[in-house]
């Protein structure tokens, strides 16, 4: 790595802007980092003015993180290659569907000894069906190592400076320290583990469970039912990792990326909120995304679809009744009120005494 570590944030949505507050402050304060942090911003017009100009002049992302000032050393750049070309650390924080295209644009245009870290909670569709981990796509396309950061980190609360924890999954110990230094703050405590695949899978699967929690809220079934859905969701997450990513540690599920992220997403996240409105309003998920998320996309429904493809291929849908039911509700194959019937006889309840 260079004497001073250059950092680029690829993405500037709600979460990207919140993390820019921490990364920018650390880059300015710590001697190992270059002070200037570039942030790739998809250019759009806001009231007749370019979003990058607004961010660089006012140090506020008025579209995705209104009311929060970004550090002055975070510089918005509308050209992806220009933002990333000098980076030693690339922080990817964009909707997962953009990653293959971004990697194509960056191939051969970044430092060969750079490292990446993905903050993206979702899977991509693998060729031939199934799922591909975002960190694997980044490594495969860009030929650089890619760690992951996942946790109970609702963007607005992180931006407010409220205390929380996060988990970095990094298979190569030599990168663990520099990544922890870049993200650790008084209010944002980082634990580094080597079990990177499990950390990343947790970050995606919990969005499916959060949709289930939202359906329960929309149906007004109460806290006991919601707790049951969360617990069964955790058990299905553990089982899914066991089947498709064997060798992971059970302890990883008790880090912030696991049970903590699951709880916070099932009570406060956008997947829960939109899923509740899906039940109460009768509108489509697409319409609710436009209405409630400023055009941003939910991760839960597409992740449920990708996971269902994998379960179907292995004949395992009946072993994952919660994931299966949530997918079917999101695709209008089942009514939300059918959710509980689907999990009444969950494998978790079929113990032999």
Swiss-Prot record:
Its EC number is 1.1.1.8. GO terms for biological process: carbohydrate metabolic process; glycerol-3-phosphate catabolic process; glycerophospholipid metabolic process. Its main location: cytoplasm. Gene3D superfamilies: N-(1-d-carboxylethyl)-l-norvaline Dehydrogenase, domain 2, NAD(P)-binding Rossmann-like Domain. The active site is at 206 (proton acceptor). It catalyses: sn-glycerol 3-phosphate + NAD(+) = dihydroxyacetone phosphate + NADH + H(+). SUPFAM superfamilies: 6-phosphogluconate dehydrogenase C-terminal domain-like, NAD(P)-binding Rossmann-fold domains. It is found in: Cytoplasm. One of its GO terms (cellular component) is cytosol. The modification Blocked amino end (Ala) is found at residue 2. It comes from the Eukaryota. Keywords: Cytoplasm, NAD, Oxidoreductase. Pfam families: NAD_Gly3P_dh_C, NAD_Gly3P_dh_N. Substrate binds at residues 121, 270-271. InterPro entries: 6-PGluconate_DH-like_C_sf, 6PGD_dom2, G3P_DH_NAD-dep, G3P_DH_NAD-dep_C, G3P_DH_NAD-dep_euk, G3P_DH_NAD-dep_N, NAD(P)-bd_dom_sf. PROSITE patterns: NAD_G3PDH (PS00957). NAD(+) binds at residues 11-16, 98, 121, 155, 270, 299. GO terms for molecular function: glycerol-3-phosphate dehydrogenase (NAD+) activity; NAD binding; protein homodimerization activity. Pathway: Phospholipid metabolism; alpha-glycerophosphate cycle. Homodimer. Belongs to the NAD-dependent glycerol-3-phosphate dehydrogenase family. PANTHER family: GLYCEROL-3-PHOSPHATE DEHYDROGENASE (PTHR11728), GLYCEROL-3-PHOSPHATE DEHYDROGENASE [NAD(+)]-RELATED (PTHR11728:SF8). This is Glycerol-3-phosphate dehydrogenase [NAD(+)], cytoplasmic. The gene is Gpdh1.
